């Protein structure tokens, strides 16, 4: 009797397969990193073939570590780095180009040309997103314009588009031999091509962007049986798809209007459940789909996306060599009482929410001879907390709801120094759940819900529990003084790229 739900979590830097029991506990998992390809400044790519190879490898690894086989798994769900764009040949499965990653800024010129008529918010009323290099539509357009033969093949129906969820679902369900070509509403809502009200591709925007409709996947709910897996998971229903941040919302059981979570990964992403109501943002946030379970109405969210948070710690490690492991940043930061007067604004890929400035680049301000590497480490951690505060302020403005606490997840939530500073700078408690692997858990929940392994959201909510709460310990005057300094530092990043 199958008694576990599996999740494939394909992230920006690594791929994991996690297997959960009915109580939401991790039974076993396997994880493998993949190569980050930087062909030019501002360009970021992944090899789709390597990602599929890693996916098969971690499925094998997780089953082996748990002493399990496909017959023990009720269903598998997929969660993924969103926006990252793959175009491949449907007959062979071969990509026509590397995956263009969400952080990649090569489509800046395409976005500027599209914004010349109607501005950055030209499509926002329909899609909830500003024109930005972050989203998939302009990336597809770049591939069609720059890869010889790609446009003709797309028009002929020979090459197809998908975000990573679509690419993996297609391969999992057979690839060239009958693979299912679908994407869920959460991933589709990040392409800039899906109408948020109809939950279908928008023909007017497709025409303006020059993207043939026949290359796009079918849009489906986040929880339903899409097909049956082949290979390592042969016979297991593929039954859940959620973009990584939406999956974390489901894993955190943020099913009520007004519930919010922040995930700290390569970047950071805060989402606020707005229910079945679309809330347009006037403060630089995104309106996005939170989830859609089966035939139930879609639930929407406001999202604040921050491009660089955890990646800044990696940069300290890999580019500067100031630390040898990410965990060391906390020890360094704790050697000093404050940031020594410096702020580090990591606009490596421009600034995302709430600014949407692709012309911004990273700055360190306030340097004096007094500053040492410990202060730099502290400023790196603080940058994550300040950026989160900016997003929270925007959310409260847009929604009219005052957040009373923030649920957190992701790798950085084990950094106590950061989490305490986060509570201090927000002025609200920060809560880490018992199962911090909420992204994978959310995908497992979506898949398990589709096959009746979990009967409703109440069953999932019963699994959620508090591991640790950080309460604010900073006085209001200090909080606002520090935050003013940050806001000033941010202005120094603008107008850098011509």
Swiss-Prot record:
<feature type="binding site">
    <location>
        <position position="310"/>
    </location>
    <ligand>
        <name>ATP</name>
    </ligand>
</feature>
<dbReference type="GO" id="GO:0006071">
    <property type="term" value="P:glycerol metabolic process"/>
</dbReference>
<feature type="binding site">
    <location>
        <position position="245"/>
    </location>
    <ligand>
        <name>glycerol</name>
    </ligand>
</feature>
<feature type="binding site">
    <location>
        <position position="83"/>
    </location>
    <ligand>
        <name>glycerol</name>
    </ligand>
</feature>
<feature type="binding site">
    <location>
        <position position="13"/>
    </location>
    <ligand>
        <name>ATP</name>
    </ligand>
</feature>
<feature type="binding site">
    <location>
        <position position="14"/>
    </location>
    <ligand>
        <name>ATP</name>
    </ligand>
</feature>
<protein>
    <recommendedName>
        <fullName>Glycerol kinase</fullName>
        <ecNumber>2.7.1.30</ecNumber>
    </recommendedName>
</protein>
<feature type="binding site">
    <location>
        <position position="266"/>
    </location>
    <ligand>
        <name>ADP</name>
    </ligand>
</feature>
<keyword id="KW-0319">Glycerol metabolism</keyword>
<dbReference type="Pfam" id="PF02782">
    <property type="entry name" value="FGGY_C"/>
</dbReference>
<dbReference type="GO" id="GO:0004370">
    <property type="term" value="F:glycerol kinase activity"/>
</dbReference>
<comment type="function">
    <text>Key enzyme in the regulation of glycerol uptake and metabolism. Catalyzes the phosphorylation of glycerol to yield sn-glycerol 3-phosphate.</text>
</comment>
<feature type="binding site">
    <location>
        <position position="134"/>
    </location>
    <ligand>
        <name>sn-glycerol 3-phosphate</name>
    </ligand>
</feature>
<dbReference type="GO" id="GO:0005524">
    <property type="term" value="F:ATP binding"/>
</dbReference>
<keyword id="KW-0808">Transferase</keyword>
<keyword id="KW-0067">ATP-binding</keyword>
<dbReference type="InterPro" id="IPR005999">
    <property type="entry name" value="Glycerol_kin"/>
</dbReference>
<dbReference type="InterPro" id="IPR043129">
    <property type="entry name" value="ATPase_NBD"/>
</dbReference>
<feature type="binding site">
    <location>
        <position position="134"/>
    </location>
    <ligand>
        <name>glycerol</name>
    </ligand>
</feature>
<feature type="binding site">
    <location>
        <position position="16"/>
    </location>
    <ligand>
        <name>ADP</name>
    </ligand>
</feature>
<dbReference type="Pfam" id="PF00370">
    <property type="entry name" value="FGGY_N"/>
</dbReference>
<feature type="binding site">
    <location>
        <position position="415"/>
    </location>
    <ligand>
        <name>ADP</name>
    </ligand>
</feature>
<feature type="binding site">
    <location>
        <position position="266"/>
    </location>
    <ligand>
        <name>ATP</name>
    </ligand>
</feature>
<feature type="binding site">
    <location>
        <position position="411"/>
    </location>
    <ligand>
        <name>ADP</name>
    </ligand>
</feature>
<feature type="binding site">
    <location>
        <position position="244"/>
    </location>
    <ligand>
        <name>glycerol</name>
    </ligand>
</feature>
<dbReference type="InterPro" id="IPR018485">
    <property type="entry name" value="FGGY_C"/>
</dbReference>
<keyword id="KW-0418">Kinase</keyword>
<dbReference type="GO" id="GO:0006072">
    <property type="term" value="P:glycerol-3-phosphate metabolic process"/>
</dbReference>
<dbReference type="GO" id="GO:0019563">
    <property type="term" value="P:glycerol catabolic process"/>
</dbReference>
<feature type="binding site">
    <location>
        <position position="411"/>
    </location>
    <ligand>
        <name>ATP</name>
    </ligand>
</feature>
<comment type="similarity">
    <text>Belongs to the FGGY kinase family.</text>
</comment>
<feature type="binding site">
    <location>
        <position position="12"/>
    </location>
    <ligand>
        <name>ATP</name>
    </ligand>
</feature>
<feature type="binding site">
    <location>
        <position position="82"/>
    </location>
    <ligand>
        <name>glycerol</name>
    </ligand>
</feature>
<dbReference type="InterPro" id="IPR018483">
    <property type="entry name" value="Carb_kinase_FGGY_CS"/>
</dbReference>
<comment type="pathway">
    <text>Polyol metabolism; glycerol degradation via glycerol kinase pathway; sn-glycerol 3-phosphate from glycerol: step 1/1.</text>
</comment>
<keyword id="KW-0547">Nucleotide-binding</keyword>
<feature type="binding site">
    <location>
        <position position="82"/>
    </location>
    <ligand>
        <name>sn-glycerol 3-phosphate</name>
    </ligand>
</feature>
<dbReference type="GO" id="GO:0005829">
    <property type="term" value="C:cytosol"/>
</dbReference>
<feature type="binding site">
    <location>
        <position position="12"/>
    </location>
    <ligand>
        <name>ADP</name>
    </ligand>
</feature>
<dbReference type="InterPro" id="IPR000577">
    <property type="entry name" value="Carb_kinase_FGGY"/>
</dbReference>
<feature type="binding site">
    <location>
        <position position="314"/>
    </location>
    <ligand>
        <name>ATP</name>
    </ligand>
</feature>
<feature type="binding site">
    <location>
        <position position="244"/>
    </location>
    <ligand>
        <name>sn-glycerol 3-phosphate</name>
    </ligand>
</feature>
